[in-house]
Amino acid sequence: MFNILIVEDDSFKSKSLSDFINLHMSNINIEIATNLQCAITKVNNSLFDLILIDMAIPSHPIHSGTGSPINLLNGGLQVILELQYLKRSDNCIVLTQYPDIEICGEYFPVKNASINIKELL
């Protein structure tokens, strides 16, 4: 079984990704995390062969009495940092609709982001 985690808060995008993966792969298990809190929980509880990570995700789900989620433009980076903290080597692909990714208060072009993320780790 090939385990995939999709970290994406937009249900249309996560369904599109799931549909594409299901069309091209078999014997897979896909889990969805729609916010940072859920993604961190899933990463701590399971191993994944591949993680697709949207960089801009909300901090937590919307529930009555929990306060409004904060939209974290680099929330996906927190997932990668959690994997590093856990000494994990799950394969990750970063997804974003923005031309730049914020890393430690600086913006880097998406095409260079993997280098900058590795330097951070």
Where are these regions (language model features)?
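Acidic, metal-coordinating helix/loop segments flanking the phosphotransfer/catalytic sites
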Residues: 18, 32-50, 58-60
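Receiver (REC) domain switch-region micro-motif
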Residues: 51-53, 83
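The short loop immediately C-terminal to the conserved phospho-acceptor aspartate in CheY-like receiver
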Residues: 56-61, 70
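Conserved acidic E/D residue at the C-terminus of a beta-strand in Rossmann-like folds
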Residues: 8
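A short, hydrophobic beta-strand element within the central beta-sheet of small alpha/beta folds
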Residues: 69-118
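Two-component/phosphorelay signaling modules centered on CheY-like receiver
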Residues: 11-31
